[in-house]
Amino acid sequence: ELYENCMSCKYPSPPIFDYIVQVEPLKVQGDTLGERIEKIEAMSESEKLSYFKEQMNKCIRCYACRQACPMCYCETCFVDINSPKWLSKEVTNEDNTIWNITRIYHLAGRCVECGACSRACPEGLDLMYLIGKMNRDTKRLFGFEAGLKIGTKGNLETFNPNDPDFFWKGES
């Protein structure tokens, strides 16, 4: 049995492989991640905020998503640092929001949408939507999609002091 995200994968044949067995391509079944994102993007701002808060209220900060994610590979995660202390040990909506937003930004341009985070979550958070939305914005803004070419760095993994966008220099 295939995972749900495999049934709606936009790349059912891997773009990178050593050897591949030719099989009939999978037919997309059910809502794709893009369709789920579009449904939520169509919501009003207050509906989106309500949806996001509902998702954050589910989180128990067990970090199963982090442990399951092949792209979470920092030697020391910011949540495990005691000085400075980024998050309290209490499970609050505010700290859950900080945790999830920070994780989403860390995965921007790296997530390959394998779904390991959503499968690992004991509370059923729609983590694939939240990270998938960031991936969609990354592709739209930077023209970058993770996992398609070997040796390329993600859009947020590089720094160029000659970047034409002056936001980081404080100029306009």
Model-derived regions, located:
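Ferredoxin-type iron-sulfur electron-transfer modules in oxidoreductases and energy-metabolism complexes
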Residues: 26-57, 71-172
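Secreted/extracellular small peptides and ectodomain modules produced from precursors
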Residues: 4-7, 63, 75, 119
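Short Cys/His-rich metal-coordination motifs, predominantly Zn2+-binding knuckles/fingers
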Residues: 9, 62, 114
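Short gly/pro-enriched beta-turn/loop segments at secondary-structure junctions
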Residues: 4, 52-54, 60-64
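A conserved mid-domain beta-alpha-beta active-site/ligand-binding segment of alpha/beta enzyme cores
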Residues: 1-26
